[in-house]
Structure formats: C-alpha cells, structure tokens
Amino acid sequence: MELHGVRTLEDDSAPKQITTVNMSVIGLVGTAPDAASGTAATLSTGSSLLDNQIVFTATAAGTAGNQLQVRAVAGEADSSAGAETGADFEDGALTITLGTDAEGVVDVSAADVVAAVNALMFDTEDMGIDAALPDGMVGDGVAAPFSLMALQGGEDDPFPLYTPALIAGSRNQAKKLGYSGTLYDDMNDILNQVGAQVIVVRVDTDEDEEAQRANILQGIESLQLGPSTLNYQPRILIAPEWSTDDGVGKALESMAARCRAIAYLDSPSMATPAEVVRRGQRYGARVELLRPRINVVSDLTGKTRGRPYSAAAAGHRVRIDSTKGYWWSKSNQVVLGFSSLEQVDSFMIGDETCVANQLNQANVSTLVQLDGFRHWGNRLCTDDPQWRFEAVRRTMDAIEDSIQLSMTKEYLDAPISKSLGVSMLSSINSYLRQQMTGGVIIGGSAWLDDELNTVASLAAGVVYINVAVTPKSPAEQIVIKYAINKNTGQVSLAA
C-alpha cells in the first residue's frame, strides 16, 4: 500500500555473532537408591493451644503443590437447623464449609473438618489436598474460618529416575544423591578435580545383573534429553561402575556420536595391558579407553578403596578446559583426588618399550608418576591419524556445533538471496578468525560451493557452504637431534 509519509524498514542482513557451545558438560549415569525425594507442599492453620490445628498437605510432592489453596468459611444456618460441615475441591482450591448451630455459630471440631476433607475423592491424575491433625492432638477444638491461603514448601524430586538432572558444581547438591549406590562416589571424584556441570541420570537398582545392565542402558538413552530439558548437552559421557561391560560401552559410544561427545570407558579391575588393548580394538573415534583404576580415600569412612578412573578423568578434562582451553590435551597434566593406583604401568621418559608408551601407541590412556599422577595419552580408539587425538575431535565438535547452532537460529528458513549468502559467510569467517586469534585453531575459512549451489539446488531450498579448519594437534612426540661440535670451546693445553 502506498504511504504519504516516511516508512521505516530494518535491514537484518548484517553478519551474526557466533558463540562457542559449552564443551565442558559431563553426562553421568548410575544408581542412588537413597537419593532425596521431593517435598509435598503444606499449610498449617489453627493453634495447638486451642486443639484446632490442622495441617493440609498436597497429595503429591513437587512445586505444583505450591499452586494449591485452602479456605474455610462459616456455613449458613437455616431457620430450623445449623449448617452442615462439607468440603469441595475445584480448580486447585479447597473450600471448607464449617458447620454451625441454629444461630450460625461455628461449632464443628477440627477433627470433623479433617474427616470431611479426607472424604473427598481426587482424580489420580490430579493434585489434591489431604488434611491431618498434628501428632498428639485430638482435634476437639472448634475450627475457625480463614481466607484463601496457599500451600508452601513443595519441592520437585531433585533426581527423578531416568530423567536428566543438573548438578552445577555443588557438593551440597551431590549430597542429595545419598551415599549408597554409585552416583555419590562418582560425583566426589569429579568434584575433587573441579566444580563441573554434570547432567546426572539416576536409574533403578536391581540385584539381577542383566536387569541392572538394562537399567543403565535406559539411563544412557536419557542423556539425549539434556538439551531439551536442561538446555545443556553432555560432551563427556561416563558410567563409571558399568562401562567395563561392552554392552554399556557400546551404548555410550553410540550416544557420544549422537551428542558429538567423547565416551570415557573404564577397564576391569586387574585387567592386563594386553586385555585392555584387545578391548580397545572394538571401539572407534568417539571413545577413550582408560587403563588404570585409582585408589581413593572415602570422605565418608576414611578408608582407601579402588575406584574406576573415568569420573576423575572427566573432571580432569573439565578442569583443563577451564584453565587452558578445550583445545588442549589433558595428557601430561596432573590429576587430583587419589592416593595411588591399583596397578602401576612401567614408565620411563624416552623409553619406547615401557608399558605406558606401548599402551599409548595402542590408543589406550593410562596414568604415570611424574611429579604427581599425570594422565598419559592423547588418543581415541581409532588409527585414523586425522581423528585419533581427543583434542582435535573436541575442537572440531565445538566449531561444527557452534556454526550449526548459529545457522539454525539466525538463517534457517530465511529467503535465499545474495545478501543471505554474504551474511552467512561473513558470520562463519568472523567466528573462525576469532578462534585463530584466541589460539584455538591454526586457520580456517568458509566459502560457497559453486559446483553444488546450482539453480536447481537453490530452487529446492538447499544452500551449500564449505568450511575448512586446521585444528591444533598435541605435540605427542618431540624429536631433539644432538651433535658434538668440536669447533667451539677448544681447550688449550699449551703451558
């Protein structure tokens, strides 16, 4: 429509800022049978001194109970008799009608009010309200009217079964897992390294080994719900007491591929180096196989006991992310939180035949003693030289996911035009330059693919962009050449 005036238009074709995704989120699966449960919302009315105190409680735990309300009103007496006591629940509000005598004076006891409320039948799918007298009270006191009041104090279950829950580096949160099962000890190993963000999936405990394995597998499947329920995507996947099992290991590997994550797998207690190496040959470029088991002093009993290494390794990875960057290898960095190793692999600097080096060459990581216990090994379970380093894999994951997220949020479904292509390329290239300046990568660039971006493909709504990145590999081997130079520092023997 034509306008006699000034029309305002906004140009949104400028390049968009790309932010690097969070690579330091751990996904943890395990058991915690004594984990804290949710709390039901409550409301207390009346007085214990008057023997008319009543406690109203939501029929289910959770914050939804905080939306419930209660009120008590005096009934209206007719000419012949007083009002009867009754209760009605509608739209989250409980209305109690207090019985009266013929003159309209409330004469119903607190005990009778409790009986009237509890006589209500609630739909099992809906939240209702129960009433009770405090312990030791008879409830003979006369109930008093009160205006609409809300129940309070309802809290959701902090760790519902098979549901991702976030522990944001807090030991107080971790204690809500309870001390039995596996998850508390796993969290302790992680938090001994750093205050990490951990997506925890609690599963049922079962004495039957196969049933327990099935529970763990179901918990691993639940990790993929992290982005949609918590807005966090797990990038380091562990199931410490269970990942010695290849069924669990393969499930973690599969989930790692879906989440663009790395799975850390533990080795069985007292496994030989040869057994560990043979097992590693079953896995690929999303798995790091850990040879050692560590001896940790319990913060509950003070006793030393053997533990899988994967939880400590995951916390160690996050600590290196925080102090140096996610593009750094965690190898040759001191690991915290344990006193000794279950088995010691021979290690000597420069010795190709020591067990630690042989494990590394077979794509297995271990721990060595070198001014503290150091993680020793850069590689994932693949022989592909381009993808065998964990640091390279995680760098590419970070860049790929960051660009993908930005393209999805800012450009997907926008009309295809020259300005769209220019803006997308400018955004990606600007981001890659930032990564170069920050020391994350050596180089990178993006360009439109002229061969694939045909008239037909563009008409079909498909745009092709090529991105080339040069990540930084860790200096896994440093070769130093020495020679004796006889022409310098000559010593004169003349008198």
Language model: regions and residue ranges:
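Surface-exposed assembly/interface segments
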Residues: 1-495
